[in-house]
Amino acid sequence: KKAVAVVFDTRQHEGAEGNGYAVYLWDITLQAFADSLGIAQGTSADLAAHDGNANTFALYETKETASPMAEAVFDLWCYGQSAYVPSVAQMRLLYTIRETVNPVIEQCGGDPLPLTDGDCWYWTSTEVAEQETAKAWLYSMGSGAIQETPKTQAHKVRPIITINR
C-alpha cells in the first residue's frame, strides 16, 4: 500500500463523525459542482458544519443533475477509505494548518496546497444559502476567503478523508 493522504486534524467536532481528517495528496483536476443549474442538490448551506461527507453523498445521489466533482471523488475510493469534498468549515481547518502539512504532502509525492493567491481556489461541498439551485462556495487556500460561484464552473477539488479510530 502507498500513502494517499496526510492527517491534518485529530479532534472530534460537534455534529461530525470520526476523530479528525486527512487531506488527499493530490488535487482532482478541474470539475464542475453540477452539470446544470436550477436544482438544489440536497447539500447543507451551513458554513460552520463539518458535513462534507454527507454533502458529497447527496451530490452523488441527486438524479436530476449529475455532479462531475462528486463522481471524480468517488472514483478515488481505494484501500477501504471514502474520500469526499470538504465543507467550508473543513476547508477552514485545512487552511490553518496548510504550511505544516505541505512538507509532509511533498515527502509523500503529493501536490502541496497553494500558499499564495493565484491558482488557489477549490470547490467545497457547501451550497450558498438561498441560492442552492445555482451556486456553491469556492475556498481560497491562498487567503482563506470564500466566494460564491455558479455550480457549472470547473474548479479544482482537494478531497479529504474522515479518520475513524
Q: Which functions belong to the PLM regions below?
A:
Residues K1-A83, C120-W121, P150-R165:
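Extracellular adhesion/carbohydrate-recognition regions
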Residues L59-A83, V88-M141:
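An exposed tryptophan-centered "aromatic clamp" motif
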Residues S143-P150:
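Carbohydrate-recognition loop of C-type lectin domains
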